[in-house]
Amino acid sequence: MAKKKTIPQYTSVERKGIQYYRTRILDADGKQVSLYATTCEELYEKQLAARRQVQEILFHRQHPTVAEYCEKWLVMQSAKVSAATLKGYASNMRNYVIKPMGDMYMEEVTADDIRLALVPLSKKSEGLYNKVNMLIKCVFYSAERSQLLEDNPCAGISGKGGKPAQKKEALSDQQVVVLLETIKGLPPYLFVMIGLYAGLRREEALALQWDCVFLDVPTPYISVRRAWRAEHNRPVISTVLKTKAARRDIPIPKCLADCLREAKATSTSDYVIADSEGQPLSYSQFKRVWQYIVVRSTKERTYYKYVNGQSIKYTVKPTLGTSQKNNPRIVYTLDFEVTPHQLRHTYITNLLYAGVDPKTVQYLAGHENSKTTMDIYAKVKYNKPEELFDVVNQALHPSGTADNAAG
């Protein structure tokens, strides 16, 4: 015969003229919480439900799932990283960590589980693979330091994977001439000039204001003091730069100084590059500006047309020198691709080709790590075998060696 449950006797209190029964329990944080009900039976059920809830919370604190701990880790990072960086973390975490492992308890995850989660990323870019790999390791090492794990499954996970990115070459002198002639008088012209002849990052160029452009001095220069970023497609200008080294003063050549003077004479905005209302560009506005370059290239395009209710895919490869059918004013004059970062890469490469000291180039480029500059330097200096032949020949067969050996 089932044992009849015993209902405890509770203290009765009066609240707003109504008689209640009351008891107190400790919540998951150790704080005392009062529970009320009009009958002892109802209060007893409330008490049991509250205790189960507290036990569940305490269990999950000691044994969180991957999804729960990832969310907690992101909250902890929010005090240290920018909103844009945190958004990137959250997106990668959601798609590549929580999706395959989110329902597992942290202590259940094995090295094989992590390797399986990384398999789809092996087909993605090397950069994305490295980011997700870093996030997984940060999460599990954090849990280990918090004594939630006895063994860290990340200990033997390799950091290498993904498809290596195709490195963009610097634009040649001829390509620079063609590019500038193509977009002369168009919206991206000033941005391109700043990238080619001052080497500013995109976020630095879009945040540049006239109070940081010094043209009426013996040596015209640009002072990098602000950075642009987009949050929900809206521009946010900040004095927080990418690194400490990004804060720099860059002397500019006459061609860029003249271009900036011409732009300043007609500008009604505080920003060097602004929209029609004088405000900094949003992310979508910048994409539209850059599209002036893309539509003039011979890059292969894909279109979709609806025929009899079906979507038909068309691939078109424009011919150099021809005009766009729907807009004859657009001529395909660029037989090479251009990216915003490529402008900066061209600036750095040209400085190194001109023999500028790598340490000076590091300062002008705003590189915090000299390795970044030296990697470009090595490529510029040592990627031409015909120019290195005499050096290598001299090193391996110094003058007089053969004669001395014969003697």
Describe the function of each predicted region.
Residues 126, 181, 185, 198, ...:
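Short, basic (Lys/Arg/His-rich) helix/loop patches that form interaction surfaces
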Residues 1-2, 217-218, 230-232, 236-247, ...:
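C-terminal secondary-structure termini that scaffold catalytic or DNA-interacting sites
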Residues 170, 365-390:
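Catalytic-site neighborhood detector that most strongly recognizes the C-terminal catalytic loop/helix
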Residues 126, 130-132, 145, 149-151, ...:
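Basic, Lys/Arg- and aromatic-enriched nucleic-acid-binding interface segment
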Residues 33-35, 62, 74-148, 165-167, ...:
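N-terminal core-binding DNA-recognition domain of tyrosine site-specific recombinases/integrases
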Residues 108-111, 141-163, 314-326, 390:
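Short, charged hinge/linker segments at domain and secondary-structure junctions
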Residues 1-38:
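Short, Arg/Lys-rich segments that mark the N-terminal edge of DNA/RNA- and chromatin-recognition modules
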Residues 107-108, 149-151, 162-181, 223-225, ...:
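DNA breakage-rejoining catalytic core of tyrosine-based enzymes
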